[in-house]
């Protein structure tokens, strides 16, 4: 039975919590679509006419289900990474220690940088919907003109977000100029450590008379 270290417990909790938060956000987005988008697309579907119990169930079911699923998946993925073969377990612990040592500002900047494309995609979709809601109130423009106008607003916002992401990447590189080299060196060190450990165990097995199945099959007694 393996005794977990405090770093392993904290890393597992962090990965599970992150997966749960991502699932909750996705679930609330689905709930918002159910209550805001579907009634516009299907006028016969009117959530306002439903009872409070049904509306509550429709609202909390997607985030509850996705929170549980994503948290469980994150936990399983972490276990597979930590307790599988190879140097990935050391990489996961080193990454957790590095993240834990960062300041709140550095965590915020790195979090934005690591998820910038998700943020840009979500902001583009939100800006497209928001601009359509605003433009759709114009009684003069045709529907085609409204679509073009809403898309122009969304593209303008997306260009601004892309420029902001470039600036964010430059700022992060300025804060950590050798980050990529350090990570690459750490991976090589962990891989060498695992290789040395496997070689040591193999030598110990030979000294104690332990023979693997592959060695038994390749031995002379199995050959005609």
Swiss-Prot record:
Residues 1-13, 76-103, 174-184 are mitochondrial intermembrane. Pfam families: HIG_1_N. GO terms for cellular component: mitochondrial inner membrane; mitochondrion; respiratory chain complex. Keywords: Membrane, Mitochondrion, Transmembrane, Transmembrane helix. PROSITE patterns: HIG1. Residues 89-180 form the HIG1 domain. Disruption phenotype: Increases frequency of mitochondrial genome loss. It is found in: Mitochondrion membrane. It comes from the Eukaryota. The keyword Transmembrane applies. The chain crosses the membrane at residues 14-38, 48-75, 104-133, 143-173, 185-204. Residues 39-47, 134-142, 205-224 are mitochondrial matrix. It is a multi-pass membrane protein. GO terms for biological process: mitochondrial cytochrome c oxidase assembly; positive regulation of protein-containing complex assembly. PANTHER family: RESPIRATORY SUPERCOMPLEX FACTOR 2, MITOCHONDRIAL (PTHR28018:SF3). Associates with a subpopulation of the cytochrome bc1-cytochrome c oxidase supercomplexes. Associates in substoichiometric amounts with complex IV. Interacts with COX3. Present with 12000 molecules/cell in log phase SD medium. Assembly factor that plays a role in the assembly of the respiratory chain supercomplexes (SCs) composed of ubiquinol-cytochrome c oxidoreductase (cytochrome b-c1 complex, complex III, CIII) and cytochrome c oxidase (complex IV, CIV). May be required for late-stage assembly of the COX12 and COX13 subunits. Required for the generation and maintenance of a normal proton motive force (PMF) across the inner mitochondrial membrane (IMM) by preventing proton leakage through an inactive population of CIV that accumulates when RCF1 and/or RCF2 proteins are absent. This is Respiratory supercomplex factor 2, mitochondrial. It comes from Saccharomyces cerevisiae (strain ATCC 204508 / S288c) (Baker's yeast).
């Amino acid at each position: 039975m393996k005794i977990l270290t405090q770093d392993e417990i904290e890393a597992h909790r962090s990965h599970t919590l992150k997966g749960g938060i991502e699932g909750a956000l996705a679930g609330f987005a689905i709930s918002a679509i159910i209550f805001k988008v579907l009634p516009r697309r299907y006028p016969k579907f009117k959530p306002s006419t439903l009872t409070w119990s049904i509306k509550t169930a429709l609202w909390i079911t997607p985030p509850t289900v996705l929170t549980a699923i994503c948290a469980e998946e994150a936990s399983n993925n972490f276990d597979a990474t930590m307790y599988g073969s190879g140097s990935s377990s050391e990489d996961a612990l080193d990454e957790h220690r590095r993240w834990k040592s960062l300041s709140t500002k550095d965590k915020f900047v790195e979090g934005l940088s690591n998820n910038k494309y998700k943020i840009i995609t979500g902001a583009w979709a939100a800006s497209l919907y928001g601009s359509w809601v605003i433009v759709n109130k114009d009684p003069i423009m045709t529907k085609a003109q409204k679509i073009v106008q809403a898309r122009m607003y969304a593209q303008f916002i997306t260009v601004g977000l892309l420029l902001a992401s470039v600036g964010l990447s430059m700022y992060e590189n300025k804060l950590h100029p050798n980050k990529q080299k350090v990570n690459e060196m750490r991976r090589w060190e962990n891989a060498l450590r695992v290789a040395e450990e496997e070689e040591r165990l193999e030598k110990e097995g030979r000294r104690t008379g332990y023979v693997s199945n592959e060695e038994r099959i390749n031995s002379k007694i199995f050959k005609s």
